[in-house]
A protein has these predicted regions:
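N-terminal interaction/assembly modules
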Residues: 1-125, 129-132, 136-175
């Protein structure tokens, strides 16, 4: 599983929690259950491969991090979505932005540009294509407010980095 797929899986978990209200740890453990997980591969290709141990740690971290800071993350979204009430933004798009903001603020190993690019990709995939511009505008404004450089990252660089991560993860699991 690539880091991008792990991020997409995190969005699924965060979004699912919007409806169940379950504790973050339970959401992750239930979805990754050895009996249940294989059934999900028929629903979405991101479930074709099981996440590595490092990716499970990532999922635990971001799902609980977003859950524990949801109000603050929504306040940030509200502040930068000028002219929009945060409750008018689809839950899924809001979850995508919550994850990206959490990564920007708390995940030092995730470059700001990657967090934003991935959020735009996921928003376009799961919402309307024009949602990508909306998400990009909000997250870009937020990043600029932090004086965080939003580096230009090409799709090729992202894919190359994900392939390297996948190779490193496999090598680490073999040790």
């Amino acid at each position: 599983m690539t880091r991008g797929n792990a991020r997409e899986l995190a969005v699924h978990l965060i979004y699912g929690r919007e409806f169940t209200g379950e504790e973050p740890e339970k959401v992750v453990s239930t979805r990754l259950d050895k009996e249940y997980y294989p059934q999900l591969s028929t629903e979405n290709e991101i479930y074709a491969d099981r996440p590595s141990k490092a990716q499970v740690r990532y999922l635990d971290t971001v799902v609980s991090g977003v859950a524990n800071r949801q109000d603050a993350l929504n306040e940030i979204i509200q502040k930068f979505s000028i002219g929009w009430d945060v409750t008018r933004i689809s839950k899924l798009t809001r979850c995508v932005m919550q994850l990206a903001i959490y990564e920007i603020l708390h995940m030092e190993d995730v470059p700001t540009g990657v967090a934003i690019s991935e959020a735009v990709r996921l928003a376009k995939k799961y919402d309307a294509p024009e949602t990508g511009s909306f998400v990009n505008g909000i997250l870009g404004s937020f990043a600029r407010s932090l004086n965080t450089p939003v580096e230009e990252v090409s799709a090729e660089e992202i894919l190359s980095a994900e392939e390297e991560e996948a190779v490193e993860a496999v090598a680490a699991e073999e040790i």
